[in-house]
Amino acid sequence: MNETPAVPPSPEVEGSLNEQISHRRRILAVLDAMKDGRALLSARIENQRGYFNTTLLKIDAEKGYVFLDELAPADGHEKIAVGQTLHLYGFYNNLPAHFAIEVIHVGEHEGIAFYAGPLPKLIHYQQKRAHFRAYVGLGKELKVRLRKGDGAQISGRLQDISLGGFGALMPADSVFEDLEIVEVEALELPDHHAIACSAEIRHSHPTQGRVHIGARFTQLAPQAERQLLQAIVELEREQLRKQSRD
């Protein structure tokens, strides 16, 4: 199974999935893309708490069935039964999507459980690219190092991040101009990797002995965008785990 973590959207994100795919051919195209891309889905059993990981194993377009891999962790499989509805969350073209499947069969193949259900009648998704913001927890120190146009280097702490940009806390004596272009020499991600790119300062203001900046990415390579997406998912997953403990 793909190791990239799946995560359900926050209520704000889920509420913004106001576009619908209802045409059968388009639904099949989306599901096939998720299956071929080995997209990891986050699954929630209706009327139950908790989220589990699964993937699409097979799409039977002729008979109109969808087959899902065994839920992980294992306690998810123990909770599922025929007649229940699985709500599934994932990404299609890097945009969040949601659909539901009624489980009509629970089977096993080579020691691994699977679930079958009819094709969903609707897929909800965000049609336009949305920059969902993930926040960096206080216990996690992710650094960002910027180089200004005059060559000065300034390092600070990453506070939030999205596919569109980031927020950071910089030293109190930092000076930034709105619309100033800076080089992001290193922006640390939760997986200990760092990306480099260019960014435009959108705003800056003093706060609690620091300077908070908001920046928009201006040049972001496809590989860096994929790394960012994975980082955002991981940060949201950590926040969900924290909320469940609280």
Curated annotation (Swiss-Prot):
GO MF terms held by the record: cyclic-di-GMP binding
The entry's keywords: Bacterial flagellum, c-di-GMP, Nucleotide-binding
Keyword hit for Nucleotide-binding: yes
Location in the cell: Bacterial flagellum basal body
InterPro entries, sorted: PilZ_domain, Split_barrel_FMN-bd, T3SS_YcgR, T3SS_YcgR_PilZN
Domain PilZ: 128-232
Any one GO cellular component localisation term in the record: bacterial-type flagellum basal body
Gene3D superfamilies, A to Z: Electron Transport, Fmn-binding Protein, Chain A, predicted glycosyltransferase like domains
Protein's GO biological process: bacterial-type flagellum-dependent cell motility; regulation of bacterial-type flagellum-dependent cell motility by regulation of motor speed
Function of the molecule: Acts as a flagellar brake, regulating swimming and swarming in a bis-(3'-5') cyclic diguanylic acid (c-di-GMP)-dependent manner. Binds 1 c-di-GMP dimer per subunit. Increasing levels of c-di-GMP lead to decreased motility.
Similarity comment: family membership: Belongs to the YcgR family.
Assembly behavior: Monomer. Interacts with the flagellar basal bodies.
Record protein name field: Flagellar brake protein YcgR
